[in-house]
């Protein structure tokens, strides 16, 4: 059963690609590109994507002060907008635990090359974020011929939607999850005898990984859309495991947030809404496919 399914899926995916690029150079007499020609085309998509990321990284590298002082290190500052708003909310509802990051985490660099390599790493991450719409467009233009005309119609705007969702995820991770994570991890103590002195690479790794992970997580509706199109995922399956998804979201939110219900809700609700939107998209795709 498994080999048959794989062969069927492989054939249904690759056949349109092989037929959809017949105008390329060096095509065979039947008007279809060979496997090696497809690899060559994919190679150029990857090269152009890498060039775009490098250009974005160079731009980010030149704006070091803005990138670090006003973006990367900002969530650790009491004046960061999220920290200020949560402190105001803490006063309004009389929940002091909501007021976070009032004592900034002390950051140190323990290697001679630490700050320079950190600068390069952050520049590359920023380059990836800046170039994401173009990178997604490059890979989308490679896989788009695998879709039938009707499927292309339904997939219009995929690049724009994926870019907006990724940006929304980055914003959510940076403004919501990152400050809460810094507060939790930076103040956590196994013993009063241990003092936290956080390495700058550890801090930046946490902030960037949280932001990127949120950006990727927000791509869930796009992933569900295409999995539903090829019949791998159904809305019934997602509804069946809805409770499991809720438990996972609540557990993750409880770990990274302060021990109060407001922070838990603040992190959980957007992720649960994202899951419900994905179910709606999967159901819509199934209805369109059966129509």
Where do the model's predicted regions map?
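Low-complexity, intrinsically disordered Ser/Thr/Pro- and acidic-rich segments
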Residues: 1-3
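Membrane topogenic/interface segments and analogous intrinsically disordered interaction regions
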Residues: 5-291
């Amino acid at each position: 059963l498994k080999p048959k399914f794989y062969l069927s899926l492989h054939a249904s995916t690759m056949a349109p690609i092989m037929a959809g690029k017949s105008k390329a150079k060096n095509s065979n007499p039947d008007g279809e590109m060979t496997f090696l020609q497809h690899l060559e085309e994919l190679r150029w998509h990857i090269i152009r994507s890498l060039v775009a990321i490098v250009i974005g990284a160079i731009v980010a590298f030149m704006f070091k002060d803005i990138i670090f002082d006003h973006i990367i290190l900002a969530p650790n500052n009491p004046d960061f907008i999220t920290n200020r708003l949560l402190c105001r909310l803490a006063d309004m509802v009389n929940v002091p635990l909501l007021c976070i990051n009032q004592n900034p985490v002390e950051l140190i660099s323990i290697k001679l090359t630490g700050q320079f390599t950190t600068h390069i790493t952050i520049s590359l991450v920023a380059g990836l974020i800046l170039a994401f719409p173009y990178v997604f467009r490059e890979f989308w233009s490679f896989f788009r011929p695998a879709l039938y005309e009707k499927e292309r119609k339904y997939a219009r705007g995929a690049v724009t939607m994926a870019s907006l969702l990724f940006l929304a995820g980055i914003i959510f991770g940076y403004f919501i999850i990152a400050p809460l994570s810094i507060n939790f991890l930076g103040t956590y103590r196994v013993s009063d005898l241990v003092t936290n002195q956080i390495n700058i690479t550890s801090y930046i790794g946490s902030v960037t990984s949280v932001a990127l992970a949120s950006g990727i997580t927000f791509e869930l509706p796009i992933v569900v859309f295409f999995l539903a199109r090829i019949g791998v995922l159904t809305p019934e399956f997602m509804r069946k495991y809805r409770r499991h998804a809720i438990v996972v979201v609540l557990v993750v939110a409880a770990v990274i947030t302060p021990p109060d219900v407001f922070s838990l809700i603040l992190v959980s609700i957007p992720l649960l809404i994202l899951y419900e939107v994905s179910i709606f998209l999967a159901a819509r795709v199934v209805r369109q496919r059966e129509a």
